[in-house]
Amino acid sequence: MKCIVGLGNIGKRFELTRHNIGFEVVDYILEKNNFSLDKQKFKGAYTIERMNGDKVLFIEPMTMMNLSGEAVAPIMDYYNVNPEDLIVLYDDLDLEQGQVRLRQKGSAGGHNGMKSIIKMLGTDQFKRIRIGVGRPTNGMTVPDYVLQRFSNDEMVTMEKVIEHAARAIEKFVETSRFDHVMNEFNGEVK
């Protein structure tokens, strides 16, 4: 079973913020397929659905970002999901808006949600899709920036990015060939 995790902070005030882009991608996939996060357990909202005949576990942690691993690890353990079947979607300050990077494994890169997942799983050997949100300008702090909603102009770009990342997930579920998916979906979204 594949496991798709979108990272974000819970609560209405965090909807459509830069830090919640992982939630946005998972929500897009769920809505497109008429799925819903119908279970809550282990500090997470989740569902198990079939896509292309395969079971897929979708998770959104119901913790704050820096505690994401406290939801992801127990749910994966409960359903016997191996880290190599995990893909985490999250915001990345080091990528410009409109860029998407898929990686087979790697460090947290300073992202507290990823640090928590790596710590709780005991490995960084899992797939991830990093979604560029750019860096703050005009002296804005990083926390203020990532908790800021996208402007209307930015949302035009980010809607394309959300759809692009969702297609990458769908392609991986269909083919199980993440290396091919990386080749097709890495880069700037037009």
From Swiss-Prot:
Any one GO molecular-function label of the UniProt entry: peptidyl-tRNA hydrolase activity
UniProt record, GO biological process: protein quality control for misfolded or incompletely synthesized proteins; rescue of stalled ribosome
Reaction catalyzed: an N-acyl-L-alpha-aminoacyl-tRNA + H2O = an N-acyl-L-amino acid + a tRNA + H(+)
Source organism superkingdom: Bacteria
Keyword Hydrolase: yes
Quaternary structure (record): Monomer.
PANTHER family documented for this protein: PEPTIDYL-TRNA HYDROLASE (PTHR17224:SF1)
Protein name: Peptidyl-tRNA hydrolase
Organism annotation: Staphylococcus aureus (strain NCTC 8325 / PS 47)
Gene name tied to this protein: pth
